C-alpha cells in the first residue's frame, strides 16, 4: 500500500522522536552506557590515548603519576568504584604508556581523572615527566576536556603537592572544565588515605548532583578470571614462582646482564659484603655492598638504589591463614583479564604463594578504604557490621586499627576473632591489595671510587607491639637476614625470609635492583665549598660525596672545603662509619671539618645538627659568602625544617635583614640548586 505524504511525515517524525528518546536515555542511563556517548572504535597507533579510549569503548580515563605505587593503587581502586557505583566505562592508564599530541581533541563525553604524586623538589614522577613537559610547553587549547585532579604529596617538603596544583592550574588555564573540585592528600600528616576518601566523596557528589548520574549499590565485579590449574605445578618451566618478569622465567638465551634496568626490569645484583653498623642490641643498621661488575648498570654519586622486596615468612603465613590459603600456596593459578584495558600485574600462570610473597603489599598498615571495600566478604554478619562501623568512622578506625599498626591479616583476624575470611575471592585481593614496589635508598658510595659496587646504608625497621606482634620494614629486615646469614653471626632475626628466591635465582645473596637518577649532586666545579648536613642514615649520600672528594684529591684534583654536620643518639652506639671519618680527614686535610651532635649522650641536654650549625655560624656564613652549596639529607618532618630555619637565622644576622626575608632568600636558593635536599 502506498504511503501518502502525511503518513510519511508521521513515520519520519516518530522515527526521529524514538531516536532522540533512545539517544537521551543512552546519555542519561548509566546502567546501560554510563552517562556518556562513545565514538566508534578504530585501529591505530597503540600509544594514541584517544584511539585506545575509542577502541575499548571507554568514557572515563584515569591517568596516574606514581613513584611508589600509591597513586596507581588509588587510580585502580577509584576506577573499580566508578564502574560499580555509576556504571562508568573506565580505563586506567600510565602516562608513560601513551602519547598526548592529540589530547586536545578529546571530546566532552569523556571524564578524565588525573591522580598525580609530587616527587623530590616539586618534580613530576618519572612516568609523568613527558606528559608534564607536553602540558607545560606544548599543549594548546583543552576546551573540550572535562577533568578533575587529586594530588599526592608531603607537607614536610618545600614544594608540597606542586605537581597536582600545577596540573590543576594548567588544565584550567588551557580551557579545561573541572567537573569536581581539586583534591590533595598529605602523607606528611599521615592522612593521605583519609584525604583521598574525602575527595572521592566530593567527586561522587559532583557526579550525582552536577552530572545527574544515578548511584547504584556497590558490588564487586572482578576484572580478572582466576582458574586453578591442577595440570601444572611449580616445576613447570612456564610457571612463575615470583621472578621479577617474564625474561627471568624464560631466561634461556637472554642476556640478563644488559640493561636498560628500571622499574620494569631489574638486575640481579650479588651482595658481596654486609656489616652491622650499630653496637646497640635493640637497634640495627646494615651497610650493604652490591656488585654490579657483571652488568652494564651504572650510577653516579648521589643516585638512589631501588631494591625489589619480598615478604617475610611470618607475614605470608598470617596472610594465608587469614584467607584460608594455607594448603594452597603451591597451587598454580592462571589469570585472564576480563577487560581489554586491564593488565595482569605480574607474570602468570603463577602460584598463590608466589603472588603473596613477591607481589602483594601484605606487611604495611591496612587502610580504611580497604576496610570498607572488604566488609561485604566478612565471615559473619556481626563482623560485617563491626567492619562497616569502624571503616565508616575515621576516629574509631584510627584508635582501633591504625594506632595498633595492624597490617591486613592482623586487622581482619582481630576483628573476626581469628575466623578466616575464606569467602574473599583471590581476584579481589589481587585487585585491591597494593602491589609490592621497589624501596629506594640513597647510595652511600662514590661512583668515582667504587665503580663496580653500590653501597647502601639502611636502618632496620623492627619493633614489637605490646601484644607480641612484630612490625617490620620489608626490605630492611630482608637485608638484616642476609647480613646475619652472610656473616654467620648466630643472631635470631625478628622475621625470616626466603633468601634463595624463585628457582634459586636469589641464592648466593642476590637481589633485584635498579638505579634511579637523582638531582642531588656535588657541584661540577670541584673547588666549590659544600656544607653537608645529615643526621642518622641521612649521612648515606654525604658519605658518598666525601668519598668522591677524597678520590679526587688522590687523583690530583683540587677540591673546595667540605664541612659535615652529623647527628646520632650516642657516639658509642649508633655513630655511623665512625672509623672512616678520620681517614677522610687525613686525605682532605684542612679542607674537611666534621661537627657531631649527639641527642642522647648527655641526659640533661639534647643536641641536634641545627644546634651545631648555629654554634658554628661564623664558619657557615663564611662558606656561604664563598658560594658554598648546602646539602641536607634525612628526616623531612622536623630536621629539614629546623636546619633551614637555622641557616635563615645565620643569613639574617650576617646580612642584617629580617628573618622572614632571610627565609625567603634561603628558599630561593633551592630553585638555584644552592640548597639541595634528599629528604623523606
UniProtKB/Swiss-Prot annotation:
Residues at which FMN binds: 66-71, 117-120, 152-161, 187
Positions bound to NADP(+): 283, 537, 599-600, 606-610, 642
Membrane topology: Single-pass membrane protein
Domain Flavodoxin-like: 60-204
Protein family: Belongs to the NADPH--cytochrome P450 reductase family. In the N-terminal section; belongs to the flavodoxin family.
Function statement: This enzyme is required for electron transfer from NADP to cytochrome P450 in microsomes. It can also provide electron transfer to heme oxygenase and cytochrome B5. Involved in ergosterol biosynthesis.
Protein's recorded name: NADPH--cytochrome P450 reductase
Amino acid at each position: 500500500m502506498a504511503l501518502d505524504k502525511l503518513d510519511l511525515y508521521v513515520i519520519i517524525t516518530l522515527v526521529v522522536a524514538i531516536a532522540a528518546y533512545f539517544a537521551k536515555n543512552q546519555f542519561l542511563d548509566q546502567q546501560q552506557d554510563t552517562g556518556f556517548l562513545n565514538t566508534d572504535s578504530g585501529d591505530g597507533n597503540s600509544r594514541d590515548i584517544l584511539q585506545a579510549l575509542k577502541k575499548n569503548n571507554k568514557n572515563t580515563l584515569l591517568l596516574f603519576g606514581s613513584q611508589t605505587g600509591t597513586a596507581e593503587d588509588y587510580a585502580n581502586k577509584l576506577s573499580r568504584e566508578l564502574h560499580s557505583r555509576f556504571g562508568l566505562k573506565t580505563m586506567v592508564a600510565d602516562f608513560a604508556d601513551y602519547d598526548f599530541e592529540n589530547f586536545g581533541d578529546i571530546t566532552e563525553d569523556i571524564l578524565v581523572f588525573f591522580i598525580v604524586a609530587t616527587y623530590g623538589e616539586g618534580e613530576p614522577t618519572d612516568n609523568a615527566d613527558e606528559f608534564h613537559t607536553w602540558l607545560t610547553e606544548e599543549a594548546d587549547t583543552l576546551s573540550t576536556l572535562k577533568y578533575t585532579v587529586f594530588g599526592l604529596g608531603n607537607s614536610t617538603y618545600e614544594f608540597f603537592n606542586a605537581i597536582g596544583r600545577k596540573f590543576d592550574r594548567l588544565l584550567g588555564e588551557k580551557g579545561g572544565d573541572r567537573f569536581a573540585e581539586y583534591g590533595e592528600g598529605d602523607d606528611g600528616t599521615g592522612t593521605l588515605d583519609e584525604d583521598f576518601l574525602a575527595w572521592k566523596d566530593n567527586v561522587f557528589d559532583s557526579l550525582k548532583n552536577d552530572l545527574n548520574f544515578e548511584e547504584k549499590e556497590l558490588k564487586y565485579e572482578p576484572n580478572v578470571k582466576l582458574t586453578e590449574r591442577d595440570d601444572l605445578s611449580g616445576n613447570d618451566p612456564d610457571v612463575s614462582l615470583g621472578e621479577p618478569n617474564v625474561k627471568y622465567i624464560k631466561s634461556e638465551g637472554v642476556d640478563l646482564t644488559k640493561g636498560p634496568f628500571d622499574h620494569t626490569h631489574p638486575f640481579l645484583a650479588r651482595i658481596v659484603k654486609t656489616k652491622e653498623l650499630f653496637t646497640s642490641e635493640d637497634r640495627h643498621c646494615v651497610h650493604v655492598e652490591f656488585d654490579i661488575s657483571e652488568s652494564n648498570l651504572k650510577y653516579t654519586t648521589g643516585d638512589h638504589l631501588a631494591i625489589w622486596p619480598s615478604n617475610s615468612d611470618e607475614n605470608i603465613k598470617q596472610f594465608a591463614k587469614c584467607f584460608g590459603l594455607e594448603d594452597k600456596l603451591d597451587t598454580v593459578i592462571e589469570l585472564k583479564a576480563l577487560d581489554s584495558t586491564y593488565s595482569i600485574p605480574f607474570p602468570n600462570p603463577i602460584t598463590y604463594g608466589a603472588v603473596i610473597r613477591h607481589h602483594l603489599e601484605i606487611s604495611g598498615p591496612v587502610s580504611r578504604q580497604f576496610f570498607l571495600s572488604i566488609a561485604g566478604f566478612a565471615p559473619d554478619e556481626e563482623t560485617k557490621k563491626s567492619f562497616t562501623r569502624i571503616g565508616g568512622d575515621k576516629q574509631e578506625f584510627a584508635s582501633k586499627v591504625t594506632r595498633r599498626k595492624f597490617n591486613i591479616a592482623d586487622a581482619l583476624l582481630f576483628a573476626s576473632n581469628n575466623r578466616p575470611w575464606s569467602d574473599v575471592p583471590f581476584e579481589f585481593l589481587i585487585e585491591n591489595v597494593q602491589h609490592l614496589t621497589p624501596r629506594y635508598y640513597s647510595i652511600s658510595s662514590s661512583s668515582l671510587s667504587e665503580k663496580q659496587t653500590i653501597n647502601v646504608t639502611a636502618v632496620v625497621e623492627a619493633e614489637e607491639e605490646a601484644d607480641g606482634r612484630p612490625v617490620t620494614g620489608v626490605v630492611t629486615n630482608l637485608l638484616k637476614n642476609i647480613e646475619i646469614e652472610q656473616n654467620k653471626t648466630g643472631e635470631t632475626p625478628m622475621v625470616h625470609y626466603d633468601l634463595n628466591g624463585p628457582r634459586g635465582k636469589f641464592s648466593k645473596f642476590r637481589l633485584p635492583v635498579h638505579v634511579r637518577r637523582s638531582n642531588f649532586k656535588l657541584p661540577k666545579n670541584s673547588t666549590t665549598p659544600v656544607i653537608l648536613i645529615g643526621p642518622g642514615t641521612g649521612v648515606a649520600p654525604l658519605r658518598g660525596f666525601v668519598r668522591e672528594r677524597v678520590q679526587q684529591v688522590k687523583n690530583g684534583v683540587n677540591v673546595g672545603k667540605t664541612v659535615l654536620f652529623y647527628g646520632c643518639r650516642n657516639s658509642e652506639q649508633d655513630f655511623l662509619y665512625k672509623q672512616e671519618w678520620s681517614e677522610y680527614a687525613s686525605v682532605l686535610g684542612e679542607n674537611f671539618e666534621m661537627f657531631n651532635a649527639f641527642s642522647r649522650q648527655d641526659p640533661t641536654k639534647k643536641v641536634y645538627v641545627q644546634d651545631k650549625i648555629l654554634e658554628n655560624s661564623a664558619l657557615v656564613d663564611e662558606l656561604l659568602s664563598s658560594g658554598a652549596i648546602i646539602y641536607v639529607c634525612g628526616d623531612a618532618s622536623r630536621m629539614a625544617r629546623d636546619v633551614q630555619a637555622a641557616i635563615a637565622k645565620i643569613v639574617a644576622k650576617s646580612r642584617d635583614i629580617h628573618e622572614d626575608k632571610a627565609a625567603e632568600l634561603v628558599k630561593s636558593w633551592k630553585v638555584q640548586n644552592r640548597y639541595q635536599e634528599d629528604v623523606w
